[in-house]
Amino acid sequence: MDRRTFLHLPVATAASFALPARAHADGLPRPASVPGGVAVVNLGPQPSPPLARFNGERVLVAGDASGWFAVVGIPLDAKVGAALPLTVERAEREPETIAFAIGRKRYATQQLSVKPEQVELSPADLARHEQERAHLRGVLRTFSESAPDSLLLLQPCEGPRSDSFGKRRFFNRQPRSPHNGLDIAAPDGTPVVAAGTGNVLDVGDYFFSGRTLILDHGRGFLTLYAHLSAIDANTGDRVPAGKRIGSVGATGRVTGPHLHFSVYLNAAAVDPELFIS
């Protein structure tokens, strides 16, 4: 079969490939083909799941023989208007490419004041951060073959959502990376639970994120819980959705107690609110 290329347009005009933007239709996250969003691409029916790749990373494929969907995490730095290629491999067929367009989304900006040494790092702190960043980059590229129990998530702690995903952040008036998670305001010690069933992939105390726990839900679908005051699970533990895994704290680079909650698909941080039921 010849190699084929399709265009996956915004959901309103590409019914043949895009899942309609219904809230959590069929147990899938809300589609949002924007930087930091999720593209849900219809791969059609076949007996076994096809293999999909995006930006060199394996992509989560969900569904069953009656219909498969690629659930693609779109990086925050994706270029608006670009047609990004999703490579799909099916048994006994040549690979095909499905391209989907990236729409525009405007994210707010935020000014934060922190200790000067948390912005201009000392040589020792910079070396520590670079080592931790390399470690976490490898962790966040994890792709395990087990399918997630669910693609819908619980809010992991009680409290108002205080800072949204994607904000362009300035620390002491200096630009830094966009906010790659959702912040939930809560007092120190508030219980934090697993947003979904998964395996504890990584536990650490990092310069910026403080005490941090990462859950692997399967097939490149990960959640991260940061700035914890305490962690109540160990690497390798299997934890069900809703089980306590730690407590809200103010560790790492923070201005006060809160939970920083991130969701990753195919190593890209995506908006957690697309998954919270």
Region annotations inferred by a language model:
Residues 211-217, 221, 237-277:
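Conserved, short, structured surface segments that act as functional micro-motifs
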Residues 5-24:
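N-terminal export signals
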